Swiss-Prot record:
Signal peptide: none annotated. This is Large ribosomal subunit protein uL3. Belongs to the universal ribosomal protein uL3 family. Its main location: cytoplasm. It holds the Pfam family Ribosomal_L3. It comes from Toxocara canis. Residues 18-31 have a biased composition (Basic residues). InterPro entries: L3_arc_euk, Ribosomal_L3_dom_3_arc_sf, Ribosomal_uL3, Ribosomal_uL3_CS, Transl_B-barrel_sf. Residues 1-35 are annotated as: Disordered.
Length: 402
């Protein structure tokens, strides 16, 4: 009996089907890390905005490797991560069908960024959202009911999460509505978690209080949208021979005569990109402060590069601008386009690999222009090389005349 002498596995994974547009623009956390009561209280996720990429030079600390104590160049991604504001507390109880929401307590004051997310058109609306919740904090009976809800959470709940939102006013984006998400609190007892959340209502939480230097995290987001694509681009099927009738970038056989329908496993043209994806094990190379603070004005320097510069490249990141708030630098690339909100989450697994525990020693961060082949790291370096330009001479002559 004859048979083919070669193997031809299917092209593309069925694990990501259906390949359709994501329902949400921001990455959704579908699982939080396992709670450990022995650890101190901490949040497990944060929302940041993708700014762009650059590259760094670091010294490898890996005994036994060929590159040990040598310099390597690696690509990094920069996320702008202004502090998030906690505006609510949610308690969950365990049921046979999984965790169920038990009680929710909202803060008294919510910003327009946060309330605007609940309206399709905030400008023309009556802006009455959360008035009933605010009135509870203003009279004695309302405050008693809030305290009663918090006490019930301490007694019956097994999981405590906070409702936090981003601050869009400090970002130079056109987007005005804040991104809101529930973030699980891990560590400590349930009563301690509720007290911690109660103390931090209406307060800002910086990104360096959630993550640490050299920590391994996960990035959850929506990929770049590519639109309607053909089967070769979408599933990476093999192109047909040159003399094929009616096209080459197609699937020659889409199934048998019977059953008289095309199975879902057959590669077809359709939507590519804008899919919800989770990328695991991204190492944090640096947690930087805002360049608007005195400490953050040199957030682009290192112990080896003492130049006073920020992490922003000359001219800013393409299609994003300048990163003025706190930032997170991770190794490698990440899903999503510029300005897209990316959810950063603590790793779900116990890290055992040597790279996860390696101390990162940055020697240099590239800040040359990303709009072309940049050769200068700072504006001062460019001025020193170029000398006086024509516009400088014109400005000096006009100053003398006046």
């Amino acid at each position: 009996m004859s048979h083919r002498k070669f193997s031809a596995p299917r092209h593309g994974s069925m694990g990501f089907t259906p390949k359709k547009r994501s329902k949400r623009h921001r990455g959704k956390v579908k699982a939080f890390p396992k709670d450990d009561p022995t650890k101190p209280i901490h949040l497990t996720a944060f929302i940041a905005f993708k700014a762009g990429m650059t590259h760094i030079v670091r010294e490898v600390d890996k005994p036994g490797s060929k590159v040990n104590k040598k310099e390597v160049v690696e690509a990094v991604t920069i996320f702008e991560a202004p502090p998030m504001v906690i505006v609510g507390i949610v308690g969950y109880i365990d049921t046979p069908r999984g965790p169920r929401q038990f009680k929710t307590v909202w803060a008294e004051h919510l910003s327009e960024d946060c309330r605007g997310r609940f309206y399709k058109n905030w400008h023309t609306s009556k802006k009455k959202a959360f008035q009933k919740h605010a009135k509870k904090w203003q009279d004695e009976d309302g405050r008693k009911s809030i305290e009663a809800d918090l006490n019930k959470m301490k007694k019956y709940c097994s999981k405590i999460r906070v409702i936090a939102h981003t601050q869009m006013k400090v970002m130079k984006h056109r987007e005005k509505k804040a991104h809101i998400m529930e973030i699980q609190i891990n560590g400590g007892t349930v009563a301690e978690k509720v007290d911690w959340a109660r103390e931090h209502l209406e307060k800002q939480v910086p990104v360096d209080s959630v993550f640490a230097q050299d920590e391994m995290i996960d990035c959850i987001g929506v990929t770049k949208g590519k639109g309607f694509k053909g089967v070769t681009s979408r599933w990476h099927t093999k192109k047909l021979p040159r003399k094929t009738h009616k096209g080459l970038r197609k699937v020659a056989c889409i199934g048998a005569w019977h059953p008289s329908r095309v199975q879902f496993t057959v590669a077809r043209a359709g939507q590519k990109g804008y899919h919800h994806r989770t990328e695991v094990n991204k190492k944090i190379y640096r947690l930087g402060k805002s360049c608007l603070t005195e400490e953050g004005k040199k957030n682009g320097g290192t112990d080896y590069d003492i130049t006073e510069k920020s992490v922003n490249p000359m001219g800013g990141f393409p299609h994003y601008g300048l990163v003025n708030q706190d930032f997170v630098m991770i190794r490698g690339c990440c899903v999503g386009s510029k300005k897209r909100p990316i959810t950063l989450r603590k790793s779900l697994i116990v890290q055992t690999k040597r790279f996860a525990h390696e101390k990162i020693n940055l020697k240099w961060i590239d800040t040359s222009s990303k709009f072309g082949h940049g050769r200068f790291q700072t504006h001062a370096e460019k001025r020193a090389f170029m000398g006086k330009l024509k516009k400088d001479l014109i400005a000096e002559s006009e100053a003398v005349k006046t």
